[in-house]
Amino acid sequence: MAITRWFFSTNHKDIGTLYLVFGAWAGMVGTALSLLIRAELSQPGALLGDDQIYNVIVTAHAFVMIFFMVMPLMIGGFGNWLIPLMIGAPDMAFPRMNNMSFWLLPPSFLLLLASSGVEAGAGTGWTLYPPLAGNLAHAGASVDLTIFSLHLAGISSILGAINFITTIINMKPPAISQYQTPLFVWAVLITAVLLLLSLPVLAAGITMLLTDRNLNTSFFDPAGGGDPILYQHLFWFFGHPEVYILILPGFGMISHIVAYYSGKKEPFGYMGMVWAMMAIGLLGFIVWAHHMFTVGMDVDTRAYFTSATMIIAIPTGVKVFSWLATLHGGSIKWETPLLWALGFIFLFTVGGLTGIVLANSSLDIVLHDTYYVVAHFHYVLSMGAVFAIMAAFVHWFPLFTGYTLHDTWTKIHFGVMFVGVNLTFFPQHFLGLAGMPRRYSDYPDAYTLWNTVSSIGSLISLMAVIMFLFILWEAFAAKREVMAVEMTMTNVEWLHGCPPPYHTFEEPAFVQIQTR
């Protein structure tokens, strides 16, 4: 029974649960790797060994957090669970392909871990730039295994994207237009389109790198007429949309949570929110070279990428102020998901502001590859994506399980986590402005103070992670069942009770459209 249910599942709820469990587990691995990094940097001098092993840990930390934590949780977990419920579909459009999308991830994860176990590991950073990722600087199978791992994760995401696009467009009731679907549905739709358009470019780039390493081609080798800068263009044409893929589903979840706990029946400016997400999705594809301001592009090219990058701040601002407008005048229920959502709005905005700073090509020449960049993207990921995941988890946990989390404990957990991540990443702005470079395992004594503070912050975050595991255990042990759900008419996913039956919407939903 367990084997047929969990290994061969074609049920969106079960596959969503598999994604949530896998993502949580990978999150533990990624957190462990990050704590190794912060332990190494807690004081000057070596702890783990040389820079190679350090960079292997950094690289693995990035890949694990991006491909095996954030994406499986947001898109695979919440997407699978909520989207069919929100549009009244009996399941995903391609339920068996959905199962395959999930089961490609554990082998992919295995290949990534294997890459660290053979030879010297892949100490390239998650960007895998040649010539460092070439077969001279990284002889052996490590980088090849990493590339195969990325191939599997990429296929998984492409199949998932096809599935979500088909489901969202074709499986809603005929009477409902796309502009009547909830914002989370829109967010995942736009995310899926971004995945579908960007991942093939990454696949091309890393396949060319694979043949450069093993088949003696010279796509990225100047000796044979190639150019390593070509790889950077291919990688970042994927890499920049990828960072929007990581945050867009979070935008959708935050919209739902802010509206729900403000006592509003809809978020402020629904159409503005949709168009803002579409604008972010489009602009995300035409700003990639802002990651390459230091490789010697023309001044007019740099001017274009600076301006285009700054334009993204406009739709992002539309979203931030719409969330604040949703809160305005509401009867606010100060429950934990709202705390996570407010933390998201504030800290994501801070991360966005440092992003505007980095968009200036002149300033980026100085700040590129310093801890200022690390601080910037960890504010939008570690306090944007992760806070959105936590908000969504605490909010929808009763829907998934039928049990409620302990109210006071989750609030304490939020407080500890909030202090921990800010103490970890805020000082890194100072280190970056003082010129401390990224991806080095050691540093001059002058940088000791803020590195020590940052590492203490990481230990506080670790306490929060352990506290979260306790909260989960407590909820399943206490078994406080959900009594009643409010506002089901504007939050359709709750309509079937907590937890919903194994099969929902087995016959088409009846939708009555009001005509004035």
Curated annotation (Swiss-Prot):
Fe(II)-heme a binds at H61, H378. Na(+) binds at E40, G45, S441. Its EC number is 7.1.1.9. O2 binds at Y244. Pathway: Energy metabolism; oxidative phosphorylation. Residues 1-11, 87-94, 171-182, 262-269, 328-335, 401-406, 479-516 are mitochondrial matrix. There is a cross-link at H240-Y244 (1'-histidyl-3'-tyrosine (His-Tyr)). One of its GO terms (molecular function) is heme binding. Binds 2 heme A groups non-covalently per subunit. Residues 41-50, 118-140, 213-227, 287-298, 358-370, 434-446 are mitochondrial intermembrane. CDD domains: Cyt_c_Oxidase_I. Mg(2+) binds at H368, D369. Component of the cytochrome c oxidase, the last enzyme in the mitochondrial electron transport chain which drives oxidative phosphorylation. The respiratory chain contains 3 multisubunit complexes succinate dehydrogenase (complex II, CII), ubiquinol-cytochrome c oxidoreductase (cytochrome b-c1 complex, complex III, CIII) and cytochrome c oxidase (complex IV, CIV), that cooperate to transfer electrons derived from NADH and succinate to molecular oxygen, creating an electrochemical gradient over the inner membrane that drives transmembrane transport and the ATP synthase. This is Cytochrome c oxidase subunit 1. It comes from Gadus morhua (Atlantic cod). The gene is mt-co1.
